[in-house]
C-alpha cells in the first residue's frame, strides 16, 4: 500500500478563498449578537476573578501589617504605655490605605494581655444579628498591651466591601454586602525595660 502526497488543487484554494470572502461580506449581525451574548458573562467572570484576587491581596497585606506591628510590640520597639486605640489604628491604616479607602472606614482592632495562651486561644469572633443583617460584635474590644514578658493577642478586622453585584450574595458575610477580613497574632513579649 503506497501513500500518495498530492498538493492542493488550485480549485480547492479558490473555493476556500471564496468562502472566506463571503463570510467577510456578511453583515447580517449574527456574529455581533453572538459576541455580545458571550462577552457579557465572560466580562462578569473576569471582574469576579479580579475582585477575588484583590480581596485576597488585601487580606495578605493586612496579615503582614498585623505581623509587623506584633513584632514591634513583642520586642519593645513600641512601648505599651505609648499605645492607645487611635495610634494603633493609625499605624495599621497608614499601611493599609494603599489597598482600602481613605481613613480605613471598616477597620476594627483588639489588642489585649492574657494570663495564658489557652485563655487567648479561647477568644472567638462574635457576630451580631442574623442573615443579611450580621455585623462584627466589638463588645469587649480594647487596646491594652501588656508589659515585658506578658502574653498578648492582636486581632485586626476589616469590613471589606464586595463590589461585583452578582458575587455579593456568595462572598459577603456581613450586612451591607461586606465580607470580614481578619488577622490574628498571639505572642509573649520579650524581656525589655518597661
Language model regions located:
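Alpha-helical assembly-interface signal, strongest on the long, hydrophobic N-terminal helix that forms
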Residues: 2-95
